[in-house]
């Protein structure tokens, strides 16, 4: 929104022209989202406490988590508000990539909100029925995937790029919609599964979002995309502002979610930010790089799939002490803080490996 005001003011005061550049608006976006999170955080927490929106802890989970019963949940609303506010202020609202990413994030946020509401009001740790949740995730995911496909303007938007290999891609055509759907919905659920310890999901999300912001800027820049020999997609650079807002809001939320957490993001947060990562990765054609950088999310998801599969196919035998994976390490004796920080360290390494694909090819 402010881009229009600064464009007008730049006619009279040349200094305002700096806000036309994506780099400057990206910086302002991360700072704005961070500041808003700091300001509204304590108020949101007090509001959630007054509403008695406390977390219900699964009885089959680690016993050490029972102490967290009653901690305010649904704190993801502050993430969504901070991100949306920063985008409204610094984003180009005519850019369809930015609009699709924002609306997809909010759509999954609504699904998560309903899920959290059922958990809180009915004191049911399982919340919304799995089939119902998956149905609505599929609806929002397919709408986002099909919209991106229908608005594609360059061949790269219907290709699967192979990282670390020069000019190597797989033409997908209409199958792009299918891939996009699985990436968006899959990432949303993967982040949701990871959100089981204080700060465990939000910090990897911040790291991956920051890296995807770099990919978005480079892919949307004619000179840099040519220099790095990656596809040029006009307009997709605006997603750097979206990613920056997610980074700022995520760091602001971490301030209150760090161990011992004052608030949990709930499904309203985890489903939304996961979908946000997925839709950005699809838009900038870095689905495989997301798979690498989000390795923690992938490992958490696979641990659940393998655990359930093993239990059903091997007469109740389990692979892990408990799933998702972070609970397995807790059961092995790792302190919660050790699990969190070690998973962060792994994510840092994976993000650096992902970013290296910009030059290694």
From Swiss-Prot:
Give the membrane topology: Multi-pass membrane protein
- Catalysis: reaction(s): UDP-N-acetyl-alpha-D-muramoyl-L-alanyl-gamma-D-glutamyl-meso-2,6-diaminopimeloyl-D-alanyl-D-alanine + di-trans,octa-cis-undecaprenyl phosphate = di-trans,octa-cis-undecaprenyl diphospho-N-acetyl-alpha-D-muramoyl-L-alanyl-D-glutamyl-meso-2,6-diaminopimeloyl-D-alanyl-D-alanine + UMP
- Top-tier EC class: transferase
Q: Which Pfam families match?
A: Glycos_transf_4
Q: Which cofactor does the UniProt annotation name? A: Mg(2+)
Q: List its EC numbers.
A: 2.7.8.13
The alphabetized UniProt keywords are: Cell cycle, Cell division, Cell inner membrane, Cell membrane, Cell shape, Cell wall biogenesis/degradation, Magnesium, Membrane, Metal-binding, Peptidoglycan synthesis, Transferase, Transmembrane, Transmembrane helix
Q: Which NCBIfam families match?
A: mraY (TIGR00445)
Described by its record, this protein's role is as follows: Catalyzes the initial step of the lipid cycle reactions in the biosynthesis of the cell wall peptidoglycan: transfers peptidoglycan precursor phospho-MurNAc-pentapeptide from UDP-MurNAc-pentapeptide onto the lipid carrier undecaprenyl phosphate, yielding undecaprenyl-pyrophosphoryl-MurNAc-pentapeptide, known as lipid I.
Family as reported in the entry's similarity comment = Belongs to the glycosyltransferase 4 family. MraY subfamily.
Q: What is this protein called?
A: Phospho-N-acetylmuramoyl-pentapeptide-transferase
Q: Which organism is it from?
A: Hydrogenovibrio crunogenus (strain DSM 25203 / XCL-2) (Thiomicrospira crunogena)
């Amino acid at each position: 929104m402010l881009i229009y005001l600064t464009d007008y003011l730049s006619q009279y005061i040349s200094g305002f022209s700096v806000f036309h550049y994506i780099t400057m608006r990206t910086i302002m976006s991360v700072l704005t989202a961070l500041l808003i999170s700091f300001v509204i955080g304590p108020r949101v927490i007090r509001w959630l406490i007054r509403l008695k929106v406390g977390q219900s802890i699964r009885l089959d989970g680690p016993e050490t988590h029972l102490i967290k019963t009653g901690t305010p949940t649904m704190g993801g609303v502050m993430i969504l508000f901070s991100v949306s506010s920063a985008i409204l202020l610094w984003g180009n609202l005519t850019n369809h990539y930015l609009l699709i990413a924002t609306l997809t994030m909010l759509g999954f946020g609504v699904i998560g909100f309903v899920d959290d509401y059922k958990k809180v009001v009915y004191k049911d740790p399982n919340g919304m029925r799995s089939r119902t949740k998956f149905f609505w995730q599929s609806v929002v995911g397919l709408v986002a995937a099909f919209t991106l496909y229908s608005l594609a303007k360059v061949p790269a938007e219907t290709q699967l790029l192979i990282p670390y290999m020069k000019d190597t891609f797989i033409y997908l055509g209409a199958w792009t919609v299918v891939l996009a759907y699985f990436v968006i919905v899959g990432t949303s659920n993967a982040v949701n599964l990871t959100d089981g310890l204080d700060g465990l999901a939000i910090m990897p999300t911040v790291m991956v979002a920051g890296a995807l912001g770099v990919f978005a800027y480079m892919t949307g820049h004619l000179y840099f995309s040519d220099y790095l020999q990656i596809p040029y997609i006009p307009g997709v650079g605006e997603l750097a502002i979206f990613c920056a807002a997610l980074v700022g809001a995520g760091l602001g939320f971490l301030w209150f979610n760090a161990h011992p957490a004052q608030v949990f993001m709930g499904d309203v947060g985890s489903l939304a930010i996961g979908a946000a990562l997925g839709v950005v990765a699809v838009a900038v054609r870095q689905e495989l790089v997301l798979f690498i950088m989000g390795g923690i999310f992938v490992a958490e998801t696979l641990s659940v799939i393998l655990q359930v599969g093993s239990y059903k196919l091997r007469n109740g035998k389990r692979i892990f002490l408990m799933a998702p994976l972070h609970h397995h390490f807790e059961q092995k004796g790792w302190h919660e803080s050790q699990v969190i920080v070690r998973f962060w360290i792994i994510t840092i390494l994976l993000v650096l490996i992902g970013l290296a694909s910009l030059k290694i090819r």
